[in-house]
Amino acid sequence: MGKDTIADLLTSIRNADMNKKGTVRVISTNITENIVKILLREGFIESVRKHQERNRYFLVSTLRHQKRKTRKGIYRTRTFLKRISRPGLRIYTNYQGIPKVLGGMGIAILSTSRGIMTDREARLNRIGGEVLCYIW
């Protein structure tokens, strides 16, 4: 039975965001590194660094906590992450069927033949793949 490192990454970020933690530490694999790079590029996390402990590499990410001010006061926005394709049920799509998350306000992360990319990049390259997760 294998481990789902993508689900572990998303769950760690979700739990740290709900508990208002500043940093998240996850095991570093090729796929988690690529997903964290996309999150960094899209502005969902502030910084990331690679850390080594006893022959194991970890990614230490600093989360971005956004606060919005309204007439009713200040409230904190949350980052929502949802795993779509999982080991028991893989979800594939062509470039025409790539979903828009919240009408284009969120992102979908896809694993394609050209690497891991966002839904916008996949549409521009006209390439489909496995829908890994939604982030909004």
Swiss-Prot record:
Keywords tagged on the record: Chloroplast, Plastid, Ribonucleoprotein, Ribosomal protein, RNA-binding, rRNA-binding
Location of this chain's protein in the cell: Plastid, Chloroplast
Gene Ontology process terms (BP): translation
GO cellular component: chloroplast; ribonucleoprotein complex; ribosome
Gene Ontology molecular function, alphabetical: rRNA binding; structural constituent of ribosome
Main localization of the protein described in the UniProt heading: plastid
PANTHER family xrefs: 40S RIBOSOMAL PROTEIN S15A
Subunit structure: Part of the 30S ribosomal subunit.
Family: Belongs to the universal ribosomal protein uS8 family.
Role according to the record: One of the primary rRNA binding proteins, it binds directly to 16S rRNA central domain where it helps coordinate assembly of the platform of the 30S subunit.
Name under which the protein is recorded: Small ribosomal subunit protein uS8c
Source organism of this protein record: Lolium perenne (Perennial ryegrass)
Lineage: Eukaryota, Viridiplantae, Streptophyta, Embryophyta, Tracheophyta
Protein's gene: rps8
